[in-house]
Amino acid sequence: MNNKLSDFEKNLYKKLKSGKLEVKVSYRTFLCPYCPDNKKKVGLYVDILQHASGVGNSQSKKRSLTEKASHRALAKYLIKDLAHYATSTISKRLKARTSFIPAETGDAPIIYDDAQFEKLVWPWKGVLVNIPTTSTEDGRSCTGESGPKLKDELIRRGFNPIRVRTVWDRFGHSGTGIVEFNRDWNGLQDALVFKKAYEGDGHGKKDWLCGATDSSLYAWLANADDYYRANILGENLRKMGDLKSIYRFAEEEARKDQKLLQRLNFMVENKQYRLKKLQIKYSQDSVKLKYETEEKEKILRAYSEDLTGRQQKSTDHFNRIFADHEKQKVQLESQIKELEIRKLELAKREAENETQRKIVAKELEQNAAINSYVQLSALEQQKTREKAQRLAVDHKMQKEKLHKRIAALERQLDQKQELELEVQQLKSQLSVMRLVELDSGSEIVNKVETFLRDLSETEGELAHLNQFNQDLVVQERKSNDELQEARRALISNLRDMGLHIGVKRMGELDTKPFMKAMRIKYCQEDLEDWAVEVIQLWEEYLKDPDWHPFKRIKLETAETIVEVIDEDDEKLRTLKNELGDDAYQAVANALLEINEYNPSGRYISSELWNFREDRKATLEEGVNSLLEQWNQAKHLKS
């Protein structure tokens, strides 16, 4: 079967070579004689060669064996006999297909033998002969035209050589030269054009071998005969290149292009893989950025709403103050008008009652002379009693706040008050007696002297008690300062020791309820930054002196008025609805502590605290706790 197909293919090749079937239409256009109705029946050399190779290599059962054999013969004819019409744009797929032509499925492939194609010298070389030479004067050597001059002459004729080398032997210029062309498809086309041109005007290789006598240059394309020739020309060709058929050259170029294609495909796949990874990362980053942007917008929106609310409250507060000011201004103007009216009425009444006022003034002057002494005495005594009562009330209030150690001071103060009252009474009685009973005789004088002595003794005792009282006050202040300094030292040393007697920051906000409530409500893990911003916002609220969410109530069991948290406050009510009772209670506790320990400054203060009983610790408890720690540390060291 294979032999019959091979013979059939050879016969078709001979017909094509003999010119019985038209293949070449023009210098650039060719056609397929076996496919008259095919769309590719007319085209460039590359297109027809690709079509013939494709049909010849086809494994489809729709193609008959004769159709495949005829197209393989056409491909062989194009490669062997019309290769000089090839261009440098032969496709990679065509070169790969022309490396071998498989037969039908199940048959052995028919492989082209490289020996059946003409082998040329590669890189492509042309041979120049019959170069004019002249002998030197001594007749020992010959000279001729140089390579560059021959190259310029070929270029003027329309050829495209890259170099022309003249061949020299031991006798000088041999009269031959080697024309070099580019080693690619363009170089091959230039070489074939060079060959055809000299063959066309009767100066080809066959013409030279037939013994031409023309003095012009003869040229042809260097092949295996020239390569293996045993002369100086063959020696130079063997040094400058190798033998290679056009078929083998196309096969090697196809392999190179195939490797390049594989490398490019690998690079494309690698770039696509990296692009896919970058797209995935971009998608993830876009989702994350979108979420963070939404969270940021939410926080900014909440902040803007809160700021707007605070500004609105400030505006409302200012408007209320301004309205109250205007109201008070109107009331004040009304009162001024009323006072002016009263002033006019009083002036009128004063003018009408001027006579009566003068009479009353005279009577008052007379009565004043009589009652002045009595009134002055009574007034002095009344002032003394009121002053004593005020002093007693003040000392009583101070006595409730002082420590037990000043009990002696309280007793001395009572004695001082009694003595002062007695002195004032004695002075008042003495003044009255001097004014009323100036003429009472010696008995009154004796009583006065007795009162004066008693008064002098009483004033001495009073001065002694005043000095003793001042000493006690100074000592008490000094002791109180020492106690406060000791308390501050305990607070500094017991800080962050984890004992039941320690330091509590009064008014500090407990953050745990906020974190817990936000995790439960929003069910997200990365809420720390958001929670910190919310906590900082409430810490700023606690420091704001304008925010006072308290109300005054009167206890039922006593007459005392106390301040409690106003549960109807807008901020506290919003906090309770948003984050629950625990966060609300944490803010309420901080407010109560600030209101108790530092209501004016509204900042956090440290206090010695009994955490076990949840109360303010005494100085004695703090000292005992510090001594226990010191004893434990001493025991561990020993």
UniProtKB/Swiss-Prot annotation:
It comes from the Eukaryota. Residues 318-497 form a coiled coil. It holds the Pfam family zf-XS. Keywords: Coiled coil, RNA-mediated gene silencing. GO terms for biological process: gene silencing by siRNA-directed DNA methylation. The keyword Coiled coil applies. InterPro entries: FDM1-5/IDN2, FDM1-5/IDN2_XH, XS_domain, XS_domain_sf, Znf-XS_domain. Acts in association with FDM4 and FDM5 for RNA-directed DNA methylation (RdDM). This is Factor of DNA methylation 3.
